């Protein structure tokens, strides 16, 4: 069984996405990561120089090429924010049209904040932290067992929506066991116009991060604040314990940096 994880957003930083890909790759080796950046320039400084620019750059031919590649997988898992949800919906529909047997999951910020909107398009959405819940889903999915009771997931079963409750948030001890994020691996692909999905290169990373030869990571999860512009409001609404900071040990993050070096 082949799995494609797909990130639809500006650039290829995608820290949460990278964490998920590393974890899934560790339990299911036949997994690839596909990045679909939405602008020609991935540099985050663009947001200072050209604020509000999120124009889609892909032609219908590009979208069909993207869908054709993804439709070869048995399981396709999208991740996107709300700003890129319309494009994600369009790609999901094209993948389904190309291969109706491909099972599609949508995770990331948009399905968490707007689950009622997101569930209309894929077979399932992830509405909370994905590491443990996806492992539970995948175990049942691969065995041919019923997976529709998996917590942190909603399912669209031919128009019948199944809404499951949330799992407890990951503890610091559980986070300690997660693999490090994936960078520059041979299973990472980036979509480029007129070329299709090609392996990521050093230049792709440097232009994406925009600040030279840097390494981005994230150590802690959780926040006590409710800023109006942030999705943290929804996280706290779903589980009040999201206000608490959680993180693996200092040794964990030191080991992560050493591995990169």
Residue ranges of model-derived segments:
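N-terminal pre-core extensions flanking Radical SAM catalytic domains
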Residues: 47-53, 226-230
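A short, glycine/small-residue-rich beta-strand->loop->alpha-helix junction that serves as a flexible
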Residues: 8-16, 80-85, 213
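Generic structural signal for well-ordered alpha-helices
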Residues: 21, 66, 88-92, 215, ...
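Radical SAM [4Fe-4S] cluster-binding motif and immediate context
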Residues: 173, 183-261
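Glycine-rich beta-alpha loop elements in corrinoid/cobalamin-binding modules
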Residues: 32, 38-40, 55-172
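Conserved SAM/AdoMet-binding glycine-rich loop
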Residues: 1-10, 32, 75, 105, ...
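A short, Lys/Arg-enriched amphipathic alpha-helix followed by its capping loop at the start of a domain
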Residues: 20-31
């Amino acid at each position: 069984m082949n799995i494609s994880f797909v990130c639809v957003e500006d650039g290829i930083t995608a820290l949460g996405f990278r964490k998920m890909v590393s974890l899934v790759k560790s339990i299911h080796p036949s997994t690839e990561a596909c990045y679909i950046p939405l602008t020609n320039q991935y540099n985050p400084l663009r947001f200072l120089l050209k604020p509000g620019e999120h124009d889609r750059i892909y032609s219908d031919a590009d979208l069909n090429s993207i869908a054709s590649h993804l439709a070869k997988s048995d399981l396709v898992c999208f991740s996107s924010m709300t700003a890129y949800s319309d494009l994600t919906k369009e790609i999901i529909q094209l993948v389904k049209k190309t291969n109706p047997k491909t099972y599609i999951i949508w995770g990331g910020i948009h399905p968490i904040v707007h689950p009622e909107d997101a569930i209309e398009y894929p077979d399932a959405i992830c509405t909370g932290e994905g590491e443990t819940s996806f492992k539970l889903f995948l175990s049942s999915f691969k065995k041919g067992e019923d997976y529709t009771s998996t917590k942190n997931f909603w399912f669209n079963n031919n128009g019948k929506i199944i809404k499951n409750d949330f799992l407890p948030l990951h503890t610091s001890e559980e986070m300690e066991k997660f693999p490090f994020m994936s960078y520059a691996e041979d299973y990472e692909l980036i979509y480029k116009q007129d070329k299709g999905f090609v392996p990521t290169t050093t230049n792709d990373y440097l232009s994406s991060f925009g600040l030279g030869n840097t390494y981005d990571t994230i150590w802690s999860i959780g926040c006590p604040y409710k800023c109006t512009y942030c999705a943290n409001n929804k996280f706290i609404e779903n589980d009040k314990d999201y206000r608490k900071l959680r993180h693996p040990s200092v040794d964990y993050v030191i080991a992560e940096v050493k591995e990169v070096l």
